C-alpha cells in the first residue's frame, strides 16, 4: 500500500491564509495523493473550509492557534512574538517531533527560514541551508539552488549544494543520475572566482556516483535545460530567479499588446489561441510553485505568498513527492559519503593550496534588515 505522507500545513500563511491554503490542500487531494494533513491555525477560520471540503476534513487534524506570523514581520520579531505558538512555528515543530514528514507554508520567507533554522538546525556537515527552486526550461524542468538563502559560498558549500540538488532532482524530476553544472561566467575551466573553480575541481575528483557533474554552465543554460541541476550561491541565484520572473512577465505583456493592437492582430490571435494557451501554461509560474529549504534536519516547502489555490496545490504536491522519496534520508547518506571521500582525497583543497575559508557570518543574507 502506498505510504501516507503527513504534511504539516501552516493554514494562516501567505497573503490569503485559509482562503487559499485549504482549498489548495483539497485540490491536491483530488489528484489521488495519499496525504494526511496536520492543519495549524485559527479553528474559527479553518472549520468553514473543512465543512466545504469533506474529503480534506476526513484526512485532516486541526491544531488550534490564533497566532500567525504577518507577511511584514521581521524574522527576529517573529521569533520573539510567535516562536512557540504561531501556526508557522508549530508546523515546523511538527516535523522536528516526527509528527509530520514535511511542512508547507506560504508565509514570510525571512521568518520561515529563521524559524526553520532555529527549530530544525542544519544537518551535520552543512554550514547553511539553501533554497532550491524548480525552473521551467525548454527541455522540461531544472532544479536551481541556492536562490536566496545566503550570500557567498566556499567550495565545500557548493559541493554540498550539488549533492542536495541532485537528491531533489531524483525525487521531483524522477532522474536517476542527474546532470549537475556550476553557474559561472563562462564554460571554460579557467574562468570564474577561485571558490567556484575549486568546487569544480572537487566535484571532478570525487566523481560522486549519485550525480553526473558536467562542468560550468552559463546563465542561458538554465532556460535551455542544459543540466538537471544548476548550482550557485544565493546572491547570483536570487538575481537569476528575479530576472527570469521579470522576463516572463515582460514577454507576456509584449504578447498581450501585440495581439490586441488591431483587427488583424486579433484575428491572428483567434487562430493561434491553442498554441498560445500551451505557451501560457509553459510559462505559468504556478506550475513550479514551491521553494524547498534544503540542508536542514527536516524539509520545509515555501509556497509563494501571492499564490492562488492551484499554485498552492502544486507546492503541496511537490512536498508530497519529496517526502515519498525520503529526500532527507537520501541527502544525509549522500553527504556522509561525500565527506568520507573528501577526507580521503589528498587534493581536497582549493586551487590556491589552502582550504576554502568559511563564509563569514556577516556575508550571510540579511533578511532581518
From Swiss-Prot:
It catalyses: a fatty acyl-[ACP] + phosphate = an acyl phosphate + holo-[ACP]. It is found in: Cytoplasm. This is Phosphate acyltransferase. The lineage of its organism: Bacteria, Pseudomonadati, Pseudomonadota, Alphaproteobacteria, Hyphomicrobiales. It holds the Pfam family FA_synthesis. The gene is plsX. Its EC number is 2.3.1.274. Residues 342-369 are annotated as: Disordered. Homodimer. Probably interacts with PlsY. GO terms for biological process: fatty acid biosynthetic process; phospholipid biosynthetic process. Keywords: Cytoplasm, Lipid biosynthesis, Lipid metabolism, Phospholipid biosynthesis, Phospholipid metabolism, Transferase. Catalyzes the reversible formation of acyl-phosphate (acyl-PO(4)) from acyl-[acyl-carrier-protein] (acyl-ACP). This enzyme utilizes acyl-ACP as fatty acyl donor, but not acyl-CoA. Belongs to the PlsX family. GO terms for molecular function: phosphate:acyl-[acyl carrier protein] acyltransferase activity. It comes from Methylocella silvestris (strain DSM 15510 / CIP 108128 / LMG 27833 / NCIMB 13906 / BL2). Pathway: Lipid metabolism; phospholipid metabolism. GO terms for cellular component: cytoplasm.
Amino acid at each position: 500500500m502506498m505510504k501516507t505522507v503527513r504534511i504539516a500545513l501552516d493554514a494562516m500563511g501567505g497573503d490569503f491564509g485559509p482562503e487559499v491554503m485549504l482549498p489548495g490542500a483539497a485540490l491536491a487531494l483530488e489528484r489521488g495523493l495519499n496525504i494526511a494533513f496536520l492543519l495549524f491555525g485559527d479553528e474559527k477560520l479553518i472549520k468553514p473550509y473543512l465543512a466545504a471540503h469533506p474529503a480534506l476534513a476526513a484526512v485532516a487534524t486541526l491544531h488550534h492557534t490564533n497566532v500567525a506570523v504577518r507577511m511584514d514581520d521581521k524574522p527576529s520579531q517573529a521569533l520573539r512574538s510567535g516562536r512557540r505558538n504561531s501556526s508557522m512555528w508549530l508546523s515546523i515543530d511538527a516535523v522536528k517531533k516526527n509528527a509530520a514528514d514535511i511542512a508547507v507554508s506560504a508565509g514570510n520567507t525571512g521568518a520561515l527560514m529563521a524559524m526553520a533554522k532555529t527549530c530544525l538546525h542544519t544537518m551535520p556537515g552543512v554550514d547553511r541551508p539553501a533554497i532550491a527552486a524548480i525552473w521551467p526550461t525548454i527541455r522540461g524542468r531544472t532544479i536551481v539552488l541556492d536562490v536566496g538563502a545566503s550570500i557567498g559560498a566556499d567550495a565545500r558549500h557548493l559541493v554540498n549544494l550539488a549533492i542536495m540538488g541532485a537528491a531533489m532532482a531524483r525525487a521531483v524530476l524522477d532522474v536517476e543520475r542527474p546532470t549537475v553544472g556550476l553557474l559561472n561566467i563562462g564554460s571554460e575551466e579557467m574562468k570564474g572566482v577561485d571558490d567556484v573553480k575549486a568546487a569544480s575541481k572537487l566535484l571532478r575528483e570525487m566523481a560522486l556516483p549519485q550525480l553526473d557533474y558536467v562542468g560550468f554552465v552559463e546563465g542561458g543554460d538554465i532556460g535551455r535545460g542544459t543540466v538537471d541541476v544548476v548550482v550557485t550561491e544565493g546572491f547570483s541565484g536570487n538575481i537569476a530567479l528575479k530576472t527570469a520572473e521579470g522576463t516572463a512577465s515582460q514577454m507576456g505583456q509584449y504578447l498581450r499588446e501585440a495581439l490586441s493592437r488591431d483587427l488583424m492582430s486579433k484575428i491572428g490571435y483567434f487562430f493561434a489561441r491553442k498554441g498560445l494557451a500551451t505557451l501560457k501554461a509553459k510559462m505559468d509560474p504556478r506550475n513550479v510553485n514551491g521553494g524547498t529549504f534544503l540542508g536542514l534536519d527536516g524539509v520545509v516547502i515555501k509556497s509563494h505568498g501571492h499564490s492562488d489555490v492551484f499554485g498552492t496545490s502544486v507546492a503541496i504536491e511537490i512536498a508530497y513527492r519529496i517526502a515519498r522519496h525520503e529526500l532527507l534520508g537520501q541527502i544525509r547518506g549522500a553527504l556522509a559519503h561525500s565527506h568520507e571521500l573528501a577526507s580521503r582525497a589528498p587534493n581536497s583543497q582549493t586551487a590556491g593550496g589552502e582550504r576554502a575559508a568559511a563564509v563569514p557570518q556577516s556575508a550571510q543574507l540579511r533578511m532581518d534588515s
